[in-house]
Amino acid sequence: SGDWDIDDNGQADALTDGLMFLRYAFGLSGDSLLNGLISSDSVITSSAEIEAELATVYASSGDIDGNGTVDALSDGLLLLRYLFGLTGNTLTTGVVGDGATVTESAALESYMSGLMPQAPYIQLNGSAFVSHEQATTYNDAGATATDVTDGSVEVFKTGAVDASVAGTYILSYSAADSEGNVSRTLTRSVTVAD
């Protein structure tokens, strides 16, 4: 995808995507690269796919401070700090590389924000797999979505559960922001049985 959302879950997160980029910049690969970083909502989970995504981002966007090289202790730490929400001097102190052409925090923040996922981040409330007792009212837990521009955005659900009829029902959830960016689609499987 070419953005900071390395695991393609719809959100760039310091403790997954940021650490993957930092470890990759240190030269780690395979299990050493991914150990403890794959979350339950990660879409890309294999080391080969993650490394391919990292190679793309590393080559096209990894030189955050513009000094001509991608360095774990400058670019990697800048990204990690940015994803943790640090700004201003707290973002840049001690990590801008030698020969950097981009040194001001505002310019660095602008560059990194341009590579944030643009679509809303959506997540299910509750489980993706639900067992429901037939002939009782089904109350769906729904989903929530947030967007970098719009904040909380409306979630659209398709599908329905007929709690009077045994079977498996699939509900789908998605969201869109005011700029027309559409989230990934999440599903919930509801099995109605006696």
Regions found by a protein language model. Give the residues of each.
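Serine/threonine-rich, repeat-prone extracellular segments and beta-strand-based repeat modules
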Residues: 130, 148-192
